[in-house]
Amino acid sequence: MKKLLLCCCAALFAANASAQPAYEPSPENLAARQRFADGRFGIFLHWGLYALLGQGEWVMTNQDIDYREYEKLAGAFCPAAFDAKAWVTAFREAGARYVCFTTRHHDGFSMFRTAQSPYNVADATPFGRDVVKELAEECRRQGLGIHFYYSLIDWWREDAPRGRTGRGTGRPAEKEDAEAYFGFMKAQLTELLTQYGPVGAIWFDGVWDQDENPGFDWRLDELYELIHTLQPACLVVNNHHLTPFEGEDVQTFERDLPGENTAGLSGQAVSRLPLETCQTMNGSWGYRITDLSYKPTDELVRYLAGAAGRGGNLLLNIGPQPDGALPAAALERLAGIGAWLRENGETIYGTQAGPVTPRAWGVTTRRGDKIYIHVLDWPDAELFVPIRGKRVREAKAFADGRRLEFRQDEEGVTLRLGERPAGPDHIVELTMGK
């Protein structure tokens, strides 16, 4: 994942704005978009050789590790505790509807068996197993979608184009060969889309690496067309921090809810595509042994509700340990989110953003004639909600069905909340009339 503030040039924008010109999503693709939006909650997994060093997924470039030295990590990668069934069971019980896994991150190591390079988890490690295959099959068995993160950057391959990251990894500049590298990526994407069953999405990352070279062409048109040809229902997601290009099916935001830009990576306009925000449980994407600053479960629940109230999904990240186990702190939070969703999932899954834009007190979601008021931060006994046009037939506390007093005028509805119950999200259900 990109850690530095993005400063993209207008020329880069123009060069990529028509990634797949005249793209017309297929009926299968449109149905997949709706399923994606209905799911609302996914799990992101950053796992690779970098976990062994315990310094996050950018350690290779942050520490300027020579690529020939870094590749030696493969000989020590033997995660005996990896259990795809245990992972997916934890995700399903947390209420997640899909999983996005790093098939190949910026360090260039493939976490699947690929004929395109021996530098992969099945051929280069004593572990000798195809992690992507096991995870995809288990997701399918348990009814979760599988999405594949795929980096456009490669700090290990000698032919990969040099960008503003990975410059200290020792690769000889004279061996750069963009044509060969793009051929490699297309061949790997073909493997991922033909050997692992239905794929919910390909999640690209790294366009921003060439923001100092505005004339650079990532040839996204070819990549997007390949994906939509091999699997028309597969969604294209690109974490470029720009407004969506033609050919993309989802707009994603990094470390921010749609419409916010607290991290400096999400200043782009919000589109009409399905939306997703990716966020970390602690402060890191890949496993970082010193990062114990996990967000409280209540904060994560509020973030999930905040995403849904903006019409978006939450893709919540976990960095598995070097031994293949999920951190205990992550499992604890997954269990807490799952408990909350079992009680309140009706107000999240399959909903749309509500009629009231996000406020200091919280957000709204809606389904049919129901509007759900998610009161995330409001200390007073009364709450004014500017809902106009339709009559409110009934207001009740979602948790226990207790009817709430309210009054309505042409400006909106004032709810008498009473004593606020414990928990991260006080939900009020409104039943609307005509």
Predicted regions span which residues?
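Sec-dependent N-terminal signal peptides
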Residues: L4-F13
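Sec/Tat signal peptide C-region and signal peptidase I cleavage site
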Residues: A15-A19
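Positively charged n-region of N-terminal signal peptides that target proteins for export
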Residues: M1-L4, F91
